[in-house]
């Protein structure tokens, strides 16, 4: 712990760490109580902020010339079931002017929405939808918060740690019916339809010329 900031092992060069620490101290002073935690690791500064302040924080990071984080990289989620606020929403930004990155995190639970940041970075639209789809994290103020990757009528959120590995239904193409069918998951081998011509499963076929490759 140095001047209120955690510097983890395998950080960047001493000069670079000093620059990031200076930026961290500046942000802590400017943003005040919005910043809950700070850390430097792997050439990046990470801030944990209050969810209610995420729009103000990202706006400052974008507009402050000393920050210049104008490139929005992505949003992702993380699930820690043992915590009271089990979810992290993680924002990654890039400053081309200063050649550095920053990671901003907020923590929330299943019922508490996180403010949408579309007004700050319009590209966050589909990333927030993806995070909602895969984790069930809600975003208040989003104009079209619906699933993005999973199918119509999908139940649950597949990247939650308590989501079953097999899922709840199996989707397959039924040769007899000539259509895609949804059925409860069955683990019996008799149920599986092996594609023996697939290079990923099935037997090893002997092809003409294979004998030449034998030692």
Swiss-Prot record:
It holds the Pfam family Complex1_30kDa. It catalyses: a quinone + NADH + 5 H(+)(in) = a quinol + NAD(+) + 4 H(+)(out). Gene3D superfamilies: NADH:ubiquinone oxidoreductase, 30kDa subunit. SUPFAM superfamilies: Nqo5-like. One of its GO terms (cellular component) is plasma membrane. NDH-1 shuttles electrons from NADH, via FMN and iron-sulfur (Fe-S) centers, to quinones in the respiratory chain. The immediate electron acceptor for the enzyme in this species is believed to be ubiquinone. Couples the redox reaction to proton translocation (for every two electrons transferred, four hydrogen ions are translocated across the cytoplasmic membrane), and thus conserves the redox energy in a proton gradient. This is NADH-quinone oxidoreductase subunit C. It comes from Methylobacterium sp. (strain 4-46).
């Amino acid at each position: 712990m140095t001047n209120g900031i955690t510097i983890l092992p395998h950080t960047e060069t001493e000069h670079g760490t000093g620059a990031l620490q200076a930026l961290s101290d500046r942000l802590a002073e400017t943003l005040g109580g919005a910043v809950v935690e700070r850390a430097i690791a792997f050439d990046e500064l990470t801030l944990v902020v209050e969810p209610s302040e995420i729009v103000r924080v990202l706006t400052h990071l974008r507009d402050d010339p000393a920050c210049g984080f104008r490139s929005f990289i992505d949003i992702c989620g993380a699930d820690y079931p043992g915590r009271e606020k089990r979810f992290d929403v993680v924002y990654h930004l890039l400053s081309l002017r200063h050649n550095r990155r920053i990671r901003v995190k907020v923590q929330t639970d299943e019922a508490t929405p996180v403010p949408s940041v579309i007004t700050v970075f319009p590209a966050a639209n589909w990333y927030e939808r993806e995070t909602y789809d895969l984790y069930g994290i809600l975003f208040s103020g989003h104009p079209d918060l619906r699933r993005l990757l999973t199918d119509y009528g999908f139940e649950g959120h597949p990247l939650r740690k308590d989501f079953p590995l097999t899922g709840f239904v199996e989707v397959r193409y039924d040769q007899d019916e000539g259509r895609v069918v949804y059925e409860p998951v069955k683990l019996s081998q008799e149920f599986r339809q092996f594609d023996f011509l697939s290079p990923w499963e099935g037997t090893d076929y002997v092809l003409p010329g294979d004998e030449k490759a034998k030692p």
